Amino acid sequence: MNSIEISTEIAKIKYWHHHFDFGDGIETKQGKEGKFCRKFQQWILSGIPEDLTDKTVLDIGAWDGFYSFSAEKRGAKRVLATDSFIWQQQELYGLDHNFWRDFGAGKQGFELARKIYNSQVEDYNIDVLELDKDKIGTFDIVLFLGVLYHMKYPLFALEKVRSVTKELLVLETHISLFFSLFPQPLMQFYPSNELSKDVTNWTGANIALVKSWLLTAGFRKAELVKWRKDRAIFHAWC
Ligand SMILES: C[S@@+](CC[C@H](N)C(=O)[O-])C[C@H]1O[C@@H](n2cnc3c(N)ncnc32)[C@H](O)[C@@H]1O
């Protein structure tokens, strides 16, 4: 694809979750929001190991796939991007009251970015709670970024994540700032749209609870590696 074709295809996609800079001045977003996404993505990226040479990487809840493509660029020999909720939204566009339809959210961004990068990243539509090593195998490094607080059953979800992790889990999540003042494992529950007006957000764990969940789910060691406002990055080792 030449630059004009790339720009045309990018413009056809109504909503990009990730900011991509494809070079030659071609970006997926402009202005303030683009700048925020870029900064946030760089912050998350800085919590992922720089060298992924010869590693297998699973990106759970990949959406547009920015972190999957980044893992490939960092030398990973195999990258599998999985998602379900947002990748299925296009199929649900016909339904009434589909909040995401108006956004235009779906899998289009992932597919176009993969084409532009000529990437070998694989994709698989699977719910977190269906993750199973017999279906997808196990991976040296697993990325679970921005997904945990969308889980109604967070500990069960982490057990599923643990079952497909061989070496290291990189977890990024929303945390409750208030409850993180306490050393005990505590959680805020969002029964409706209290967090960011999004009804798919359920939990705001504190730092201690995320670590406890990781150990309970079967990881040998769990550490907080970065913390900014109400977002935190943890590493957990098998
Ligand atoms: C806030 S986005 C995070 C996207 C990306 N990982 C990032 O950090 O930018 C949450 C993602 O989790 C996915 N997701 C939510 N619930 C899921 C589920 N039950 N199974 C699989 N993916 C899910 C959504 O479709 C969406 O892509």
Task: Show where each model-derived region lies.
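Glycine-rich phosphate-binding loop and adjoining beta1-alpha1-beta2 segment
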Residues: 88-114
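Conserved alpha-helix/loop element of class I SAM-dependent methyltransferases that forms part
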Residues: 32-53, 70
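Conserved SAM-binding strand-loop segment of SAM-dependent methyltransferases
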Residues: 118-129
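N-terminal, positively charged/glycine-rich alpha-helical extensions of SAM-dependent methyltransferases
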Residues: 1-27
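Conserved class I S-adenosyl-L-methionine
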Residues: 55-63
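Conserved SAM-binding motif I beta-strand of class I
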Residues: 78-84
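S-adenosyl-L-methionine-dependent methyltransferase catalytic module, highlighting the catalytic core
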Residues: 129-135, 139, 143-144, 152-238
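Conserved SAM-binding loop of SAM-dependent methyltransferases across substrates and taxa
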Residues: 64-76
